[in-house]
Protein backbone atom coordinates (compact mmCIF):
# COMPACT_ATOMS: atom_id res chain seq x y z
CA UNK A 1 0.00 0.00 0.00
CA UNK A 2 1.31 3.46 -0.79
CA UNK A 3 0.05 5.33 2.28
CA UNK A 4 0.16 3.03 5.26
CA UNK A 5 -0.40 5.87 7.76
CA UNK A 6 -3.67 6.79 6.08
CA UNK A 7 -5.12 3.37 6.81
CA UNK A 8 -4.20 3.55 10.50
CA UNK A 9 -6.28 6.56 11.43
CA UNK A 10 -9.67 8.22 11.02
CA UNK A 11 -9.65 9.62 7.45
CA UNK A 12 -10.67 13.25 7.70
CA UNK A 13 -11.14 15.45 4.64
CA UNK A 14 -7.47 16.42 4.43
CA UNK A 15 -6.22 12.83 4.65
CA UNK A 16 -8.81 11.64 2.15
CA UNK A 17 -7.60 14.18 -0.37
CA UNK A 18 -3.96 13.23 0.18
CA UNK A 19 -4.85 9.57 -0.38
CA UNK A 20 -6.89 10.31 -3.52
CA UNK A 21 -4.11 12.49 -4.91
CA UNK A 22 -1.56 9.74 -4.30
CA UNK A 23 -3.71 7.17 -6.10
CA UNK A 24 -4.27 9.43 -9.11
CA UNK A 25 -0.56 10.25 -9.34
CA UNK A 26 0.48 6.61 -9.19
CA UNK A 27 -2.16 5.44 -11.68
CA UNK A 28 -2.58 7.98 -14.47
CA UNK A 29 -5.56 6.13 -15.94
CA UNK A 30 -7.65 6.97 -12.85
CA UNK A 31 -10.07 9.86 -13.20
CA UNK A 32 -10.85 11.97 -10.13
CA UNK A 33 -13.71 14.46 -10.16
CA UNK A 34 -16.22 16.03 -7.76
CA UNK A 35 -19.88 15.11 -8.14
CA UNK A 36 -20.76 18.17 -6.08
CA UNK A 37 -19.95 19.97 -2.85
CA UNK A 38 -21.14 19.71 0.73
CA UNK A 39 -22.92 22.49 2.61
CA UNK A 40 -19.52 23.75 3.79
CA UNK A 41 -18.01 23.60 0.32
CA UNK A 42 -16.05 20.38 0.64
CA UNK A 43 -15.79 18.35 -2.55
CA UNK A 44 -17.69 15.07 -2.78
CA UNK A 45 -15.04 13.23 -4.77
CA UNK A 46 -15.45 10.30 -7.11
CA UNK A 47 -12.74 8.10 -8.61
CA UNK A 48 -13.26 6.02 -11.73
CA UNK A 49 -11.42 3.35 -13.65
CA UNK A 50 -12.36 1.43 -16.77
CA UNK A 51 -15.21 1.80 -19.25
CA UNK A 52 -17.51 4.58 -18.05
CA UNK A 53 -20.09 3.66 -20.71
CA UNK A 54 -21.17 0.75 -18.52
CA UNK A 55 -20.38 1.81 -14.94
CA UNK A 56 -21.10 0.39 -11.50
CA UNK A 57 -21.01 2.40 -8.29
CA UNK A 58 -19.60 1.71 -4.83
CA UNK A 59 -20.57 4.63 -2.53
CA UNK A 60 -19.51 5.08 1.09
CA UNK A 61 -19.74 7.14 4.24
CA UNK A 62 -23.19 8.66 4.09
CA UNK A 63 -22.87 9.07 7.86
CA UNK A 64 -20.28 10.89 9.94
CA UNK A 65 -19.37 7.94 12.14
CA UNK A 66 -18.99 5.53 9.23
CA UNK A 67 -15.62 6.69 7.84
CA UNK A 68 -14.45 3.09 8.36
CA UNK A 69 -15.88 2.42 4.90
CA UNK A 70 -13.74 5.15 3.33
CA UNK A 71 -10.70 3.14 4.40
CA UNK A 72 -12.19 -0.06 2.97
CA UNK A 73 -13.15 1.35 -0.40
CA UNK A 74 -9.93 3.28 -1.03
CA UNK A 75 -7.90 0.19 -0.16
CA UNK A 76 -10.02 -1.82 -2.60
CA UNK A 77 -9.80 0.80 -5.33
CA UNK A 78 -6.03 1.00 -4.96
CA UNK A 79 -5.74 -2.78 -5.21
CA UNK A 80 -7.94 -2.83 -8.32
CA UNK A 81 -5.80 -0.11 -9.93
CA UNK A 82 -2.69 -2.20 -9.33
CA UNK A 83 -4.35 -5.32 -10.75
CA UNK A 84 -5.56 -3.38 -13.80
CA UNK A 85 -2.10 -1.96 -14.47
CA UNK A 86 -0.31 -5.28 -13.99
CA UNK A 87 -3.10 -7.34 -15.59
CA UNK A 88 -3.57 -9.50 -12.53
CA UNK A 89 -6.31 -12.03 -11.98
CA UNK A 90 -7.94 -11.91 -8.54
CA UNK A 91 -10.28 -14.68 -7.42
CA UNK A 92 -10.49 -15.88 -11.04
CA UNK A 93 -11.60 -12.42 -12.19
CA UNK A 94 -9.49 -10.84 -14.94
CA UNK A 95 -9.56 -7.26 -13.68
CA UNK A 96 -8.22 -5.72 -16.89
CA UNK A 97 -10.76 -7.53 -19.04
CA UNK A 98 -13.71 -6.82 -16.74
CA UNK A 99 -12.92 -3.11 -16.41
CA UNK A 100 -12.56 -2.68 -20.15
CA UNK A 101 -16.18 -3.80 -20.37
CA UNK A 102 -17.45 -2.22 -17.16
CA UNK A 103 -16.22 0.88 -15.36
CA UNK A 104 -15.97 1.16 -11.59
CA UNK A 105 -16.83 4.43 -9.87
CA UNK A 106 -16.24 4.83 -6.14
CA UNK A 107 -17.36 7.68 -3.93
CA UNK A 108 -15.27 7.35 -0.77
CA UNK A 109 -17.23 9.91 1.25
CA UNK A 110 -20.73 11.17 0.45
CA UNK A 111 -20.85 13.22 3.68
CA UNK A 112 -17.49 15.00 4.18
CA UNK A 113 -18.92 17.60 6.58
CA UNK A 114 -20.39 14.90 8.80
CA UNK A 115 -17.04 13.14 9.01
CA UNK A 116 -15.27 16.39 9.92
CA UNK A 117 -17.83 17.07 12.66
CA UNK A 118 -17.48 13.56 14.08
CA UNK A 119 -13.67 13.66 14.07
CA UNK A 120 -12.92 17.32 14.80
CA UNK A 121 -16.10 18.72 16.33
CA UNK A 122 -18.52 21.52 15.46
CA UNK A 123 -15.76 24.06 14.84
CA UNK A 124 -14.88 22.20 11.63
CA UNK A 125 -18.07 23.65 10.10
CA UNK A 126 -18.02 27.31 11.22
CA UNK A 127 -21.12 28.33 9.29
CA UNK A 128 -23.19 25.73 11.17
CA UNK A 129 -21.25 25.63 14.45
CA UNK A 130 -23.99 27.30 16.50
CA UNK A 131 -26.64 24.94 15.14
CA UNK A 132 -24.51 21.87 15.80
CA UNK A 133 -23.76 22.98 19.37
CA UNK A 134 -27.46 23.62 19.90
CA UNK A 135 -28.27 20.10 18.71
CA UNK A 136 -25.65 18.35 20.87
CA UNK A 137 -22.72 19.00 23.16
CA UNK A 138 -21.05 15.76 22.05
CA UNK A 139 -20.33 15.18 18.35
CA UNK A 140 -18.64 11.80 18.86
CA UNK A 141 -21.81 10.12 17.58
CA UNK A 142 -22.63 12.58 14.80
CA UNK A 143 -24.10 10.99 11.65
CA UNK A 144 -25.89 13.83 9.88
CA UNK A 145 -24.65 16.56 7.57
CA UNK A 146 -23.72 20.04 8.83
CA UNK A 147 -27.29 21.13 9.42
CA UNK A 148 -28.47 18.04 11.19
CA UNK A 149 -30.06 16.10 8.33
CA UNK A 150 -29.41 12.38 7.99
CA UNK A 151 -28.54 12.00 4.31
CA UNK A 152 -29.72 8.40 4.16
CA UNK A 153 -33.17 9.53 5.30
CA UNK A 154 -33.34 12.32 2.71
CA UNK A 155 -33.89 10.42 -0.55
CA UNK A 156 -37.33 10.40 -2.16
CA UNK A 157 -38.32 6.80 -1.50
CA UNK A 158 -40.94 6.13 1.14
CA UNK A 159 -39.94 9.43 2.72
CA UNK A 160 -43.37 10.25 4.18
CA UNK A 161 -43.62 6.86 5.89
CA UNK A 162 -40.12 7.28 7.25
CA UNK A 163 -41.05 10.70 8.66
CA UNK A 164 -43.82 9.02 10.64
CA UNK A 165 -41.32 6.56 12.08
CA UNK A 166 -38.99 9.44 12.97
CA UNK A 167 -41.81 11.31 14.70
CA UNK A 168 -42.74 8.20 16.68
CA UNK A 169 -39.19 8.23 18.03
CA UNK A 170 -39.39 11.93 18.90
CA UNK A 171 -37.19 13.08 16.01
CA UNK A 172 -38.87 16.20 14.63
CA UNK A 173 -35.99 18.53 13.80
CA UNK A 174 -32.26 18.69 13.12
CA UNK A 175 -30.49 15.93 15.03
CA UNK A 176 -27.21 14.00 15.16
CA UNK A 177 -28.94 11.15 13.32
CA UNK A 178 -32.19 9.99 11.71
CA UNK A 179 -33.80 13.34 10.90
CA UNK A 180 -34.71 13.17 7.21
CA UNK A 181 -35.10 16.90 6.57
CA UNK A 182 -38.19 18.97 5.83
CA UNK A 183 -38.57 17.48 2.36
CA UNK A 184 -36.89 14.84 0.18
CA UNK A 185 -33.66 15.94 -1.48
CA UNK A 186 -33.49 19.07 0.68
CA UNK A 187 -29.72 18.64 1.04
CA UNK A 188 -27.01 19.52 -1.46
CA UNK A 189 -25.24 16.22 -0.83
CA UNK A 190 -28.24 14.05 -1.67
CA UNK A 191 -29.06 16.18 -4.71
CA UNK A 192 -25.47 15.84 -5.94
CA UNK A 193 -25.65 12.06 -5.70
CA UNK A 194 -29.12 11.98 -7.27
CA UNK A 195 -28.05 14.08 -10.25
CA UNK A 196 -24.89 12.04 -10.70
CA UNK A 197 -26.87 8.79 -10.82
CA UNK A 198 -29.41 10.24 -13.25
CA UNK A 199 -26.53 11.20 -15.52
CA UNK A 200 -24.48 8.01 -15.26
CA UNK A 201 -27.26 5.37 -15.19
CA UNK A 202 -25.28 2.77 -13.26
CA UNK A 203 -25.72 -0.93 -14.00
CA UNK A 204 -25.89 -1.51 -10.26
CA UNK A 205 -24.81 0.16 -7.04
CA UNK A 206 -23.64 -0.83 -3.58
CA UNK A 207 -24.04 1.57 -0.66
CA UNK A 208 -21.69 0.86 2.25
CA UNK A 209 -22.64 1.61 5.84
CA UNK A 210 -21.64 0.20 9.21
CA UNK A 211 -22.15 -1.91 11.25
CA UNK A 212 -23.64 -5.42 11.57
CA UNK A 213 -22.22 -7.52 8.69
CA UNK A 214 -25.62 -7.49 7.02
CA UNK A 215 -26.95 -6.95 3.50
CA UNK A 216 -30.21 -5.20 2.62
CA UNK A 217 -31.34 -5.95 -0.92
CA UNK A 218 -35.10 -5.37 -0.83
CA UNK A 219 -37.31 -2.31 -1.09
CA UNK A 220 -40.94 -2.71 -2.13
CA UNK A 221 -40.70 -4.68 -5.40
CA UNK A 222 -36.95 -4.84 -6.09
CA UNK A 223 -35.44 -5.92 -9.41
CA UNK A 224 -34.46 -9.57 -9.49
CA UNK A 225 -30.85 -8.50 -9.92
CA UNK A 226 -30.93 -6.65 -6.59
CA UNK A 227 -31.75 -9.90 -4.86
CA UNK A 228 -29.09 -11.73 -6.88
CA UNK A 229 -26.51 -9.04 -6.12
CA UNK A 230 -27.23 -9.37 -2.41
CA UNK A 231 -26.93 -13.13 -2.62
CA UNK A 232 -23.63 -12.81 -4.45
CA UNK A 233 -22.16 -10.47 -1.86
CA UNK A 234 -23.40 -12.76 0.91
CA UNK A 235 -21.93 -15.86 -0.73
CA UNK A 236 -18.43 -14.43 -0.93
CA UNK A 237 -18.35 -12.45 2.33
CA UNK A 238 -20.34 -14.51 4.80
CA UNK A 239 -22.51 -11.48 5.57
CA UNK A 240 -26.16 -12.36 6.18
CA UNK A 241 -29.10 -11.03 4.19
CA UNK A 242 -31.49 -9.19 6.51
CA UNK A 243 -34.17 -6.52 6.69
CA UNK A 244 -33.44 -3.11 8.21
CA UNK A 245 -35.38 -1.83 11.25
CA UNK A 246 -38.47 0.31 10.64
CA UNK A 247 -36.60 3.55 11.40
CA UNK A 248 -34.11 2.68 8.64
CA UNK A 249 -36.65 1.60 6.02
CA UNK A 250 -37.19 4.07 3.18
CA UNK A 251 -35.53 7.40 2.57
CA UNK A 252 -32.24 5.76 1.69
CA UNK A 253 -30.01 5.84 -1.36
CA UNK A 254 -30.52 2.16 -2.12
CA UNK A 255 -34.28 2.58 -1.73
CA UNK A 256 -34.36 5.47 -4.20
CA UNK A 257 -32.24 3.61 -6.74
CA UNK A 258 -34.57 0.62 -6.60
CA UNK A 259 -37.85 2.52 -6.31
CA UNK A 260 -37.25 5.37 -8.76
CA UNK A 261 -34.33 4.44 -11.00
CA UNK A 262 -35.18 0.71 -11.11
CA UNK A 263 -31.44 0.17 -10.66
CA UNK A 264 -30.29 -3.00 -8.89
CA UNK A 265 -28.81 -1.89 -5.58
CA UNK A 266 -27.95 -3.18 -2.13
CA UNK A 267 -26.87 -1.75 1.21
CA UNK A 268 -23.94 -3.45 2.93
CA UNK A 269 -23.38 -2.92 6.66
CA UNK A 270 -19.70 -3.60 7.33
CA UNK A 271 -18.01 -4.56 10.59
CA UNK A 272 -19.12 -5.43 14.09
CA UNK A 273 -19.26 -3.32 17.23
CA UNK A 274 -20.30 0.27 17.85
CA UNK A 275 -19.75 3.17 15.47
CA UNK A 276 -17.32 4.66 14.88
CA UNK A 277 -15.57 1.36 14.26
CA UNK A 278 -11.83 1.65 14.98
CA UNK A 279 -9.43 2.05 12.08
CA UNK A 280 -7.44 -0.84 13.55
CA UNK A 281 -10.29 -3.20 12.58
CA UNK A 282 -10.42 -2.19 8.93
CA UNK A 283 -7.84 -4.61 7.52
CA UNK A 284 -9.52 -7.66 9.06
CA UNK A 285 -12.86 -6.51 7.66
CA UNK A 286 -11.33 -5.80 4.28
CA UNK A 287 -10.00 -9.34 4.06
CA UNK A 288 -13.48 -10.60 4.92
CA UNK A 289 -15.23 -8.72 2.10
CA UNK A 290 -12.40 -8.51 -0.44
CA UNK A 291 -13.62 -11.48 -2.47
CA UNK A 292 -17.19 -10.16 -2.53
CA UNK A 293 -16.02 -6.75 -3.73
CA UNK A 294 -14.10 -8.37 -6.57
CA UNK A 295 -16.75 -10.92 -7.54
CA UNK A 296 -19.46 -8.24 -7.67
CA UNK A 297 -17.43 -6.36 -10.28
CA UNK A 298 -18.07 -9.31 -12.58
CA UNK A 299 -21.79 -9.51 -11.72
Regions found by a protein language model. Give the residues of each.
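Proline/glycine-enriched tight loop/beta-turn segments at coil->beta junctions
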Residues: 50-56
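A short loop-to-beta-strand scaffold at the N-terminal edge of the catalytic core in hydrolase folds
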Residues: 40-48
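Structural recognition of the beta-strand scaffold that forms the well-ordered cores
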Residues: 34, 45, 57-59, 105-108, ...
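C-terminal accessory segments enriched in acidic
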Residues: 1-19, 26-32, 88, 161-299
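N-terminal carbohydrate-binding/catalytic regions of secreted carbohydrate-active enzymes
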Residues: 31-36, 40
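Generic recognition of short, well-ordered alpha-helical segments
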Residues: 44, 68-72, 228, 280
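Active-site/substrate-binding loop(s) of hydrolase catalytic cores
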Residues: 53, 67-68, 75, 81-218, ...
